[in-house]
Amino acid sequence: KWCAPLLDLPAHCYPQSYFARRIELGASEVNRLFLTACGVTHSLIETGFRGTEIHGPDGMAKLAGHKVDKVIRLETTAEKLLDTGTVTSESFVTDFARELAIAAKGAVGLKSIVAYRYGLHFEPSPPSQQEVQKAIEPVLRQVDSGAPARIDDPILLRHLIFAGLELNLPIQFHIGYGD
């Protein structure tokens, strides 16, 4: 019910005391105390946004003291692949399918941020390979110029979703913070 008692403080302590105690214990210990006390027994974690700045599944499992499974973000997987500079418009469909299958090993689900990048009013059918090849060309030029890949073309976003469906994993559609 109250966070302060988990830190060995009175429930209604002064804010200064609360923050001082958090600083004294350190972020890892405070996170461990809160996560183990919350009663959650299984978590899912998606590391596609600022993945190097957060705990991955193993780190969260250690902190939380319970099972943590991973969810793979489609757009991040594709953009990391494109940023390697090894992809062509002809190879993208096959290369992405391979990379997604590798990334999804052991995952319990996938996630798309199509709503954030384009919206949810998109053609609900898979694009043709020719459409994907044409749509990926501007992204490849972007990467060739030294900029990081960013997929926001509706044809490419649809392709990622339909490629994800081939893995028979559930897909979460991010439509806002906290979903």
Task: Describe the function of each predicted region.
Residues K1-L167:
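Metal-cofactor-binding active-site regions of metalloenzymes
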Residues H174:
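Conserved binding/catalytic microenvironments
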Residues Y177-G178:
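Short glycine/proline-centered loop/turn elements that form peptide/ligand docking sites
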